[in-house]
Curated annotation (Swiss-Prot):
Domain remark text: The cysteine framework is I (CC-C-C). Alpha4/7 pattern.
Protein name: Alpha-conotoxin-like Pu1.5
Keyword Iron: no
Protein's organism: Conus pulicarius
GO molecular function, one term: ion channel regulator activity
């Protein structure tokens, strides 16, 4: 049992070090986009492929926006008579 414990400790403490064999592994050669990969909900609802994944969220947001727009159009009074 103690041997298994030592193997687990050894396996979790191994620190990877950079290798000079593969030049594609260093950061200079693998430049990626600086843009964040995550989309905001508004961006996702605007993209058809992403919209399908969170359709209920997009529809709820559209319904809320429509209700809010309708509420803003209602006449209101500041004083009660």
């Amino acid at each position: 049992m103690f041997t298994v414990f030592l193997l687990v400790i050894l396996a979790t403490t191994v620190v990877p070090f950079p290798s000079d064999r593969d030049p594609a592994s260093n950061h200079e050669n693998s430049k990626g986009s600086n843009r964040n990969a995550w989309l905001t909900p508004e961006e996702c609802c605007a993209a058809p492929a992403c919209r399908e994944m969170i359709l209920e969220f997009c529809l709820a947001g559209e319904a809320f926006a429509a209700a809010l727009d309708g509420f803003r159009r209602l006449p209101y009074r500041l004083s009660s008579e």
